């Protein structure tokens, strides 16, 4: 390969793969060893390794095909499924390089070792782990583990939780709307918040101005703390109730509730249990499709197997029982679920005490509320709750159960007493997923006896006028595979006084035609207060015009009602930049009424997401009116390292820092780049879950070298976790080294260049070539091997080229270094 070709190839390779580990001072090791041998006649087969991951300061001259001992960043596969990337120590045993895996590390990978092996390197073979293999060329570690040793891999301990930084941060939103250039409406929302250890103080204030009328309002103030070991969340102050039994209300008081985010899906989500009876010693095989998820031997008698999310992905299960005589029995287990249903043995609760806000209670009365969900065996969940306040009491109980092919059913009965009014509420729900038919059926029926009062109704003194009598809703959905999707929804609501009775039905069909996506909809609505039925037909067509640049799409919609009103709209919309941070939309609408009146409206809007906030503007106008709208949405974070102007922070977020380097893309959220001081805010993380913070390496400038582009955090609820990526700014150079006697340092010689606290490291190849990155200014590079050392200086002139260049250097040995 020509030198120019090699340089270009290495540039591309570097930008794609070079993420050295500066945390362990393993930066800039010579991955050039992969590439340069293509043009040499020596060492082409003896050496094949990724030298980025050699241990820091490892003084090793390569003289055999056996890789060196030390720590390597490897991809770990459990039963051929990638679980994580981690730094693992390796040592030589016999003629192999083997990993040192402690009992704690195996446990973090979801592998249970039920022995007292507390050695630094556990005896995996004695623990029952059948096979461990290391593919050095790709740095992949494969571990084959029997099913009985596997646990929930995503399980997290309290020591893994990051409570984040101490911070004072503000979210703000500013809106202005102008109508006909004279009527003005302004809205400002400010949320000053404090994070201190695991405590969260949250506030929100709003300002509204409608022409000359101005109002300030405080929405809420509350203090929150999570207790991971107890799986509960504490809130003191103004907040909203949270319940699986009752509707939600605003209140001032104290709330203690189970935080379901603290559980893994397999710990909390309902999954079926397999039950049966074996006539003799039998083999039980449970399959999902062609995959065996249970293969166990059982004695004669009843048996039961819980299905965990680790193995089960939802859907129909096939059970096969084979007795000692070879006789087989087979049956199918279908399952469905409802939101109220929980894992067998799990209890979820909410307890609240305080005062209702005046919009729910005329006098801000004291109230208390509690509810419990408990997952039982035999695929059912029991739940119930209570509410009481001044002159009011409500008691509720219910069950949700999975009846197999007929679906999941819920029955809930509540009884209320308010002053002299008594009543009850019955709710029946059903959810069936007919997976063999790619269809789903859901219905919800409510009946209320007159006199039943909800907690929100006591503010109206239990007014029985316009009380709900019954409601019924039905939803059908069917996938037609390549022919699209069909759905039908029906709703009927009836009141005791018949004042607001209504019936509605809609039929929707979605399909694709070539590149176009087409949705048709027919709806029928009947309201008690209107004699005439409202019938509407609509069609919407969306056609992508390009995906290579700008992601531009056109759209057309038409709607016609039996009232004589027809509306049509045509437009084009799109986005610019790879992360779609600049969006735009242009629409032209036309409405024709039965009296012959026609209204034409034009609309144009744009939105830009920057590192410092999201800014929006729009204009709409017709021959009779015009409207302008402007909005700014963002945040300010004050922390120990300074001030960061960011996008609006979500409930849980991450503050990323890359040493004073701007314009580096972080994650997938549009507009999230490092700002002028190297900070960027990732606004939305999942609390108590593993979140990966990823830098988009395609946007990293050539003169920036990052120690790592991916880190993982597990934040507590409401936390702002700080994630720091070490970076070096400087040029990349290939040095051609010779010693004073005309020879070259041997293959595997280690080079070091110290720049402040950073240490750049490289490895010399078999032709005396040394690759270094992140070099700036001037300095001295030391090269060591087998107790010997030589050094050479470099200057700004050597590193001035923006392209990867070759610089010849003589590496001189100090006089006292010996030969």
UniProtKB/Swiss-Prot annotation:
The record gives the membrane topology as: Multi-pass membrane protein
Keyword Flavoprotein attributed: no
SUPFAM superfamilies annotated for this entry? FimD N-terminal domain-like (SSF141729)
GO BP terms: pilus assembly
Identify the domain of life. Answer: Bacteria
Q: Which GO terms describe its cellular component?
A: cell outer membrane
Provide the family line: Belongs to the fimbrial export usher family.
Which PANTHER family does the record associate with it?
A: FIMBRIAL USHER DOMAIN-CONTAINING PROTEIN YDET-RELATED, OUTER MEMBRANE USHER PROTEIN
**Know the name of this protein?**
Outer membrane usher protein CssD
- What species was this sequence derived from? Escherichia coli
Q: Please state the gene responsible for encoding this protein.
A: cssD
């Amino acid at each position: 390969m020509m030198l120019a070709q090699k340089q270009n190839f290495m540039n591309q390779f570097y930008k794609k793969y070079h993420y050295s580990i500066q945390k362990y001072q393993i930066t800039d090791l010579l991955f050039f060893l992969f590439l340069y041998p293509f043009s040499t006649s020596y060492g082409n087969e003896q050496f094949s390794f990724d030298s980025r991951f050699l241990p820091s300061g490892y003084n090793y001259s390569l003289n055999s095909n056996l890789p060196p001992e030390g720590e390597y960043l490897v991809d770990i596969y459990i039963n051929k499924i990638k679980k994580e990337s981690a730094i693992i120590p390796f040592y030589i045993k016999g003629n192999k390089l083997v990993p040192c895996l402690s009992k704690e590390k195996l446990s973090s990978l979801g592998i249970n070792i039920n022995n007292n092996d507390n050695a630094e390197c556990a005896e995996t073979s004695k623990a029952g782990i059948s096979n461990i293999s290391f593919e050095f060329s790709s740095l992949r570690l494969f571990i084959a583990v029997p099913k009985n040793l596997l646990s929930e891999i995503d399980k997290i301990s309290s020591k893994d939780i990051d409570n984040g930084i101490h911070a004072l941060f503000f979210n703000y939103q500013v809106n202005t709307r102008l109508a006909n250039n004279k009527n003005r409406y302004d809205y400002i929302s400010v949320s000053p918040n404090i994070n201190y250890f695991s405590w969260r103080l949250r506030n929100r204030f709003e300002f509204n101005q409608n022409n000359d009328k101005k109002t300030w309002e405080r929405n809420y103030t509350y203090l929150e703390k999570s207790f991971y070991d107890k799986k509960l969340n504490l809130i003191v102050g103004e907040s909203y109730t949270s319940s699986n039994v009752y509707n939600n209300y605003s209140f001032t008081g104290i709330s203690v509730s189970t935080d379901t985010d603290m559980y893994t899906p397999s710990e909390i989500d309902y999954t079926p249990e397999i039950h049966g009876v074996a006539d003799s010693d039998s083999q039980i095989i449970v399959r999902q499709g062609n995959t065996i998820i249970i293969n166990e031997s059982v004695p004669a008698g009843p048996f039961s197997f819980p299905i965990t999310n680790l193995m089960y992905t939802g859907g129909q299960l096939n059970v096969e029982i084979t007795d000692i005589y070879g006789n087989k029995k087979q049956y199918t287990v279908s399952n469905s679920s409802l939101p109220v249903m929980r894992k067998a043995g799990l209890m979820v609760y909410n307890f609240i005490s305080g005062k209702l806000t005046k919009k729910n209670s005329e006098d801000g009365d004291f109230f208390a509320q509690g509810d419990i969900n408990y997952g039982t065996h035999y695929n059912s969940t029991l739940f119930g709750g209570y509410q009481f306040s001044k002159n009011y009491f409500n008691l509720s109980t219910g069950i949700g159960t999975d009846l197999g092919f007929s679906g999941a059913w819920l029955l809930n009965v509540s009884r209320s007493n308010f002053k002299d009014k008594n009543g009850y509420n019955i709710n029946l729900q059903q959810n069936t997923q007919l997976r063999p038919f790619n269809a789903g059926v859901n219905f919800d029926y409510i009946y209320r006896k007159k006199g039943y009062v909800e907690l929100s109704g006591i503010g109206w003194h239990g007014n029985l006028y316009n009380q709900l009598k019954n409601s019924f809703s039905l939803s059908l959905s069917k996938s037609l595979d390549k022919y699209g999707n069909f759905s039908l929804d029906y709703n009927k609501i009836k009141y005791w006084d018949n004042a607001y009775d209504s019936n509605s039905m809609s039929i929707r069909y979605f399909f694709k035609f070539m590149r176009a996506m087409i949705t048709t909809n027919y709806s029928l609505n009947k309201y008690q207060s209107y004699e005439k039925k409202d019938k509407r037909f609509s069609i919407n067509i969306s056609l992508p015009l390009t995906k290579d640049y700008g992601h531009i799409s056109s759209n057309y919609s038409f709607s016609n009602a039996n009232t004589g009103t027809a509306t049509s709209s045509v437009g084009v919309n799109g986005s610019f930049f790879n992360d779609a941070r600049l969006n735009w939309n242009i629409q032209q609408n036309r409405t024709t009424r039965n009296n012959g009146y026609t209204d034409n409206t034009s609309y144009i809007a744009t939105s830009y997401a920057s590192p410092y906030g999201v800014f929006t503007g729009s204009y709409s106008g017709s021959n009779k009116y015009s409207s302008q709208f402007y909005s700014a949405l963002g945040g300010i974070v004050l922390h120990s390292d300074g001030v960061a102007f960011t996008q609006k922070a979500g409930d849980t977020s991450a503050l990323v820092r890359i040493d004073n380097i701007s314009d580096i893309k972080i994650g997938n959220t549009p507009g999230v780049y490092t700002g002028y001081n190297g900070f960027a805010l990732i606004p939305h993380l999942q609390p108590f879950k593993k979140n990966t913070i990823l830098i988009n390496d395609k946007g990293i400038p050539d003169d920036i070298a990052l120690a790592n582009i991916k880190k993982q955090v597990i934040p507590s609820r409401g936390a702002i976790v700080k994630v720091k990526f070490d970076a070096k700014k400087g040029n990349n150079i290939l040095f051609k080294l010779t010693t004073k006697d005309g020879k070259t340092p041997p293959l595997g010689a280690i080079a070091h260049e110290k720049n402040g606290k950073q240490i750049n490291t490289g490895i010399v190849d078999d032709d005396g070539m040394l690759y270094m990155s992140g070099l700036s200014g001037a300095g001295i590079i030391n090269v060591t091997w087998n107790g010997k050392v030589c050094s050479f200086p470099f200057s700004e002139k050597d590193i001035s080229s923006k392209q990867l260049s070759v610089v010849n250097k003589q590496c001189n040995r100090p006089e006292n270094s010996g030969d």
